[in-house]
UniProtKB/Swiss-Prot annotation:
Residues that hold Mg(2+) 3 according to the record: 231-233
Reported function: Catalyzes two subsequent steps in gluconeogenesis: the aldol condensation of dihydroxyacetone phosphate (DHAP) and glyceraldehyde-3-phosphate (GA3P) to fructose-1,6-bisphosphate (FBP), and the dephosphorylation of FBP to fructose-6-phosphate (F6P).
TM region(s), chain numbering: none
Record gene name: fbp
Cofactor(s) needed: Mg(2+)
Keywords: Carbohydrate metabolism, Gluconeogenesis, Hydrolase, Lyase, Magnesium, Metal-binding, Schiff base
Organism, scientific name: Methanothermobacter marburgensis (strain ATCC BAA-927 / DSM 2133 / JCM 14651 / NBRC 100331 / OCM 82 / Marburg) (Methanobacterium thermoautotrophicum)
Domain of life, source organism: Archaea
Entry binding sites for beta-D-fructose 1,6-bisphosphate: 18, 90, 103-104, 132, 241-242, 265, 286, 347
EC number: 3.1.3.11, 4.1.2.13
Name of the protein this chain belongs to: Fructose-1,6-bisphosphate aldolase/phosphatase
Subunit note: Homooctamer; dimer of tetramers.
Pfam families: FBPase_3
Example GO BP: gluconeogenesis
Binding site for Mg(2+) 1: 11, 18, 52, 94
Length: 365
């Protein structure tokens, strides 16, 4: 019997702006998920938050895109929204784009990453949760995990990794997808993945047998809503060890705080800072963007753990570097490259400014 992991997240309210989800919201989610576990919909669950996003980590036997599981997550977020409204929290229910559930949570606002697999004798899984950034934030670290031998030594020396992986890439603008193999199509793959606001990794499979290796939430809130709602704040599930990169190879890419889109009002580039869960409270200019990593063992569809993967002094220098990069980027104020390019400002005030100035623009000599 196969095990399914579903990680579904949403921002349904925060204390003092966009800093952190209130504990009362997580408690309400816990009540809903506990009932689902007791009735057999879920086998196990763990609730955490990265900044103002609540992340529901659930295991079950129902496969991906299961209506009952998605309904459970939706109910949890709806109930938490009511609590948020009672506390007058900021952005109560902001990620929920509909009032009624329609059978699948996709397209309704919350982000969702899922994978189904037959458990190995030992099955380590790492769940990554971000705040103040977009799904493309995972492009670079996932590429390094599964295609860069300078990061993942196993690609060179481990026979079970040596034949590489297949990357399923979504074009979130045109709503198309393509699957590309590494190392054969590495350069073509990088040509896409470098455009992190448009091309995003959805899933990664092992080439030898098609076994699932990683899954990412790819929902783009603003594209769904047609206006600025908030940043997408993606989540990812990554399997480790025994045919996949070692746990240390999985977290290693985050030692480099690469630049991602998001931060203040979802309109600025900044470094992705790897932090312990307790430090996932983005405050400076609503950031800089954060990522947490929780490591579990999957045992008969139960979650063993977690271990806080970035609660490690060896990442202290990465955090220091991220702070230095944040300081440098902030000094640019409203100028690029700190502010996103104009084609990424569609849901801000920029279109209105251009419309207001339309009659004042003249042809140049």
């Amino acid at each position: 019997m196969k095990t399914t992991i579903s990680v579904i997240k949403a921002d349904v309210g925060s204390v003092a702006g966009h800093a952190v989800a209130h504990e009362a919201l997580k408690k309400k989610c816990d009540e809903i998920l506990a009932e689902a576990r007791d009735t057999g919909i879920l086998e196990d669950y763990y609730i955490t938050n990265c900044g103002d996003d609540i992340d529901l980590i659930m295991t079950h036997r129902n496969g991906e895109e299961n209506e009952e599981v998605h309904q459970t997550a939706w109910n949890a977020f709806r109930e938490a929204t009511e609590v948020a409204r009672g506390l007058k929290l900021y952005g109560a229910g902001q990620d929920l784009l509909s009032d009624t559930f329609s059978g699948n949570i996709k397209g309704m606002g919350p982000g969702c990453a899922e994978m189904e697999f037959k458990e190995r004798p030992s099955d380590p899984v790492i769940i990554f949760c971000c705040d103040k950034t977009e799904p493309g934030a995972f492009n670079l670290p996932l590429f390094r995990m599964f295609a860069d031998p300078f990061n993942t030594a196993g690609l060179v020396i481990d026979p079970t990794l040596h034949n590489g992986y297949e990357f399923e890439v979504f074009d979130v603008v045109e709503h198309k997808k393509v699957t590309m193999a590494c190392p054969d199509e590495m350069y073509d793959l990088l040509a896409l993945l470098g455009s992190i606001s448009r091309y995003v990794i959805k899933k990664i499979h092992r080439r030898d047998d098609g076994e699932i290796a990683a899954s990412v939430s790819t929902e783009r809130l603003n594209l769904m809503a047609g206006k600025y709602i908030g940043k997408d704040d993606p989540v990812a599930i990554v399997r480790a060890q025994s045919g996949f990169p070692a746990a240390g190879e999985v977290v290693e890419p985050f030692a480099f705080p690469h630049l991602v889109g998001g931060w203040m009002r979802g309109s600025h580039n900044g470094p992705l800072m790897p932090v312990a869960q307790r430090d996932a409270t983005p405050v400076r200019f609503d950031g800089p963007p954060r990522v947490i990593g929780l490591g579990f063992q999957i045992a008969d569809c139960k979650l063993v753990g977690p271990i806080d993967m970035f609660d490690d002094p060896s990442f202290d220098r990465s955090r220091q570097l991220a702070s230095e990069i944040a300081e440098y980027m902030r000094r640019h104020g409203p100028f690029e490259p700190h502010r996103l390019p104009s084609d990424e400002m569609e849901y801000t005030s920029l279109p209105g400014v251009l419309e207001k100035l339309g009659d004042r623009f003249e042809d140049m000599d």
